[in-house]
Amino acid sequence: MADVYELFLTCPKGLESLLLEEAQGLGLDEARAQVSAVRGQGSLEVAYRLCLWSRLANRVLLVLARFPVENAESMYMAVHAVNWEDHLDAGGTLAVEFSGKGSGIDNTHFGALKVKDAIVDNLRERSGRRPSVDKVNPDVRVHLHLDRGQATLSLDLSGHSLHQRGYRLQQGAAPLKENLAAAVLIRAGWPKIAAEGGALADPMCGVGTFLVEAALMAADIAPNLKRERWGFSSWLGHVPALWRKLHEEAQQRAAAGLARPPLWIRGYEADPRLIQPACNNIERAGVADWVKIYQGELATFEPRPDKGQTGLVICNPPYGERLGDEASLLYLYQNLGERLRQSCIGWSAGVFTGAPELGKRMGIRSHKQYAFWNGALACKLLMIQVEPRQFVTGERGERNDEGLARAPSEPARLSEGGQMFANRLQKNLRQLGKWARRDKIECYRLYDADMPEYALAVDIYGDWVHVQEYAAPKSIDPAKAQARLFDALAAIPQTLGVAQERVVVKRRERQAGKKQYERQSSEGKFLEVGEGDVRLLVNLTDYLDTGLFLDHRPMRLRIQKEAAGKRFLNLFCYTATATVHAARGGARSTTSVDLSKTYLDWARRNLSLNGFSDKQRLVHGDVMEWLREDDGQYELIFIDPPTFSNSKRMEGVFDVQRDHVELLDLAMARLAPGGVLYFSNNFRKFELDESVQARYAVEEITGETLDPDFARNPKIHRAWRITVR
């Protein structure tokens, strides 16, 4: 065996420079960094120290050979030429990992198989015995990397990846790997802060990875001290006495570190389900005297160390994957900035984020940013010195008396565009607010893409705000579109005086196929709102639409005025809001037809909320099929079909432009003498067929069915009054 080995350390992308410094400190000579790795030379003792003490490496590989590869056979011969009796007992177990490609080897499974065959054949030829394969816990794990015709053959001394310290058996939804968490702490300056007796707090600690890694550093505990099985444990080149010496030395250092007065290291987590797993992880790591976890919301975060010392606030805020998460993320960062400004003066803060653009919403300048990768996600560590001179805040948004909630909102610093958007909201609120108060309207559209660069619809639902982002055209840079959305979301709470958590955001785009019916969420929260003298249920979170088409408000009120004593038919009834108005107006009976059981259940709730049930008929079925079979007569009919509709419960696809003639003919056959049919749809390119106008008395009433909040968008729908000639 050689006295000095070539050693190859792998690590996550972005940690190379930190690992280089760490490896040099542990004795690696001639060290140099490359992508996701550090290579150098060292003795077996250095290799052992790297395995035991590296907080950043994934694996420690001992290089056995480097050689050119022309084809699979030349690779086989080069691997076969290694004296494997120095490394593996012929009756032992083996695992082979292969990475890279080239020289006719484009399949890693095939490459690994050729390497395995070469090793097995070598040992069988020398001893008459052959090793078996064990992919989980082999005696020796061999790795071959092929890059541009050059192969590196290595032994994996670490075994399982070194980030697996053994303490984190329970984890949350999106945990950081332990070595990435350690790297973030090192970049954030924790080793120096800890050496000076400083404190550490994580306001969103999850299962406590930052906390444990911080305690291991502060107490001088080798990160892999408790690992029982190593890649070198059954390697024939292993020197147990040397390993025991280094392991005992690490145990003594850990004991000395834990004997010191513990630093103040605290974590706070809002999700009660994560508290016990976090405590279990801390206990397994052996740092329960150093680390404490408390359940607490970010809004109450206020670190107060026993001795009044400052230190480091470190956190990894969640990043959103679900449509509509933008608002909650924006407000989370604003709240984090608020807590830092109010409760952490004099502290350093490190915010590790996959959405660095949100860091600007904290209202504190970051003086340093470090690039990292969390798997395939590009991330940044934003370093902040929490001092008033670093604060960036704007003026508190002007409050209003338009009937919106008075919940205070921490003012966010608005960009120039964000301030323009806020100004437009205020202008619209002054104009529409008077009308809404006069007519006792709780729900209305405040803003509808008035400024093209802010392509949003902003709807008021009592003291809630429902925001729909229109999908940007492909010609628009997605990053710019997202930045504008964030500008708008920052402006809305302070301009309208609503609590941040009462702003709901969705993205509206052209619907296709089943997507029109997809749930956006599953919160199941219904909000009761008023429209005239009826109460209606809306759901702002679960579906793209809320259950109440605001643009049809005048039509519903017209139906209520005309319904007295009449039989009312509502086709494609959705949540039957028009039916509720008809019933309130004194309709003799109501019949509402829709293909969705979900919306019919919603309709039943709306009717029940207003005290209607027995006389109101709800029909689950395909409207066209139902009309062909129904023989009832109705004095008042309302039809507001979707642009298209498909379902496994109906044959074919309903297309309003193609099918409206048949639909209207079927419905007019059900119209009682002297009755009125109201027909509306929101297909912007819709043209009413001339044959309909020839057969019936048709009057377009679109202008009469638009209130001031939709006057800016006259194409939101079209409506007709149709009677028998």
UniProtKB/Swiss-Prot annotation:
Superkingdom of this protein's organism: Bacteria
Reactions catalysed: guanosine(2445) in 23S rRNA + S-adenosyl-L-methionine = N(2)-methylguanosine(2445) in 23S rRNA + S-adenosyl-L-homocysteine + H(+); guanosine(2069) in 23S rRNA + S-adenosyl-L-methionine = N(2)-methylguanosine(2069) in 23S rRNA + S-adenosyl-L-homocysteine + H(+)
UniProtKB keywords: Cytoplasm, Methyltransferase, RNA-binding, rRNA processing, S-adenosyl-L-methionine, Transferase
Subcellular location, record wording: Cytoplasm
Molecular-function GO terms, alphabetical: 23S rRNA (guanine(2445)-N(2))-methyltransferase activity; RNA binding; rRNA (guanine-N2-)-methyltransferase activity; rRNA (guanine-N7-)-methyltransferase activity
GO CC terms of this entry: cytoplasm
Pfam families in the record: Methyltrans_SAM, RlmL_1st, THUMP, UPF0020
The protein's role, per its UniProt record: Specifically methylates the guanine in position 2445 (m2G2445) and the guanine in position 2069 (m7G2069) of 23S rRNA.
Family of this protein: Belongs to the methyltransferase superfamily. RlmKL family.
Protein name per the record: Ribosomal RNA large subunit methyltransferase K/L
Organism: Pseudomonas aeruginosa (strain ATCC 15692 / DSM 22644 / CIP 104116 / JCM 14847 / LMG 12228 / 1C / PRS 101 / PAO1)
